[in-house]
A protein has these predicted regions:
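N-terminal "assembly arms/tails" that initiate or stabilize quaternary assembly
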Residues: 1-74, 264, 268-271
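Extended, solvent-exposed, turn-rich assembly/linker loops in the middle of proteins
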Residues: 123-193
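Alpha-helical scaffold segments that mediate packing/assembly in large oligomeric complexes
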Residues: 86-152, 266-272
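Short helix/loop capping segments that flank catalytic or ligand/cofactor-binding pockets
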Residues: 53-56, 169-172, 257-259
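Short acidic, glycine/tyrosine-flanked loop/strand segments centered on an H-E-D-like triad
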Residues: 69-91
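Extended, compositionally biased alpha-helical segments that mediate assembly or anchoring
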Residues: 237-272
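Short, surface-exposed beta-edge/turn micro-motifs
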Residues: 41-42, 155-159, 245
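Glycine/small-residue-rich hydrophobic helix-like segments
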Residues: 192-240
Length: 272
């Protein structure tokens, strides 16, 4: 078995890991504001306040809205996902085996992305209902009202992420699961990836925080949370003679930030 690694193979494998990460590594990255190719250890997301329109006199100056621009800093950290591969030569010729290893690295980095975003969502203190029951219709409507009263845009960019227990409870709500209310195209029974309801894309996630039997679910607008990434996923493959194996290390720099607290409503759901 050769212990030398062609740079062309490393680049190909690196590209496959990055494409897998972009395609399916993270479930939440596409639901938030994203910045790519960030240079340095941090970046800034702008939180823009509300503006007001007003009249002007003839030949007078156009009034300025004086929007509040608040910078929100997002720190980036380096994350690594590595594993030992005994037979690297097989990865060079066996596409299926190579894809399995590439996906494993991409999924690990994607789970870290979701973990960072969930940690920021958990900072929300805008609670709908209590933590003494599950995901009920009343709790959902209370959160819906909170979003509206906070002037969170109803522009198709609202997202709700819930646990699998809560997803099962949603299926018990007729307005969510019946074609009489949502039409045949939006029936959740046709697939469990995601479903649009109340102008929001609902999706189940296994990584939401569970504290004392209470699952923290979140309903938010895309502009309320941000994710930043440095350079694309990088891959390093090195031979270790003492282990007679190659070490495949995938790495990327990323971070997350809660930009606007008013754009997030948290639903605390009891799991029995």
């Amino acid at each position: 078995m050769s212990t030398t690694i062609a740079q062309a193979f490393v680049k190909q494998f690196e590209r496959e890991v990055h494409e897998a990460y972009q395609r399916m590594g993270s479930k939440l990255r596409n639901t938030v504001r994203s910045k790519n190719n960030v240079q340095g250890a941090s970046t800034v997301f702008q939180k823009v306040g509300k503006g007001a329109a007003s009249t002007k006199s003839r030949h007078g100056a156009v009034p300025v809205m004086n929007l509040d621009h608040t910078p929100v800093e997002c720190a980036l950290y380096d994350f690594y996902a590595g594993d030992w591969v005994d037979r690297l030569d097989e990865l060079k010729t066996n596409i299926d085996e190579r894809q399995i290893i590439a996906n494993a690295g991409a999924y690990a980095l994607g789970r870290k992305t979701d973990e960072l975003l969930i940690a920021e969502l958990n900072k929300s203190v805008n609670y709908a209902g209590s933590a003494a029951d599950g995901l009920t219709k009343a709790k959902i409507l209370a959160a819906f009202e909170m979003m509206g009263e906070a002037d969170v845009p109803d522009d198709g960019q609202r997202y709700a992420v819930v646990g699998w227990k809560q997803w099962s409870q949603l299926l018990g709500i007729e307005e969510f699961a019946s074609s009489d209310y949502v039409g045949t195209d939006e029936l959740p029974w046709r697939g469990t990836q995601a479903k649009r309801w109340l102008g929001t894309l609902w999706l189940p996630h296994s990584g939401l925080t569970l504290n004392g039997g209470v699952r923290l679910c979140h309903w938010y607008h895309k502009t309320a949370v941000g994710h930043a990434a440095g350079a694309d996923v990088k891959t390093d493959i090195t031979w270790h003679g003492d282990r007679a194996a190659h070490f495949v290390n995938n790495m990327m720099s990323q971070g997350a930030a809660l930009i606007d607290t008013t754009g997030v409503v948290t639903l605390r759901c009891l799991e029995g």
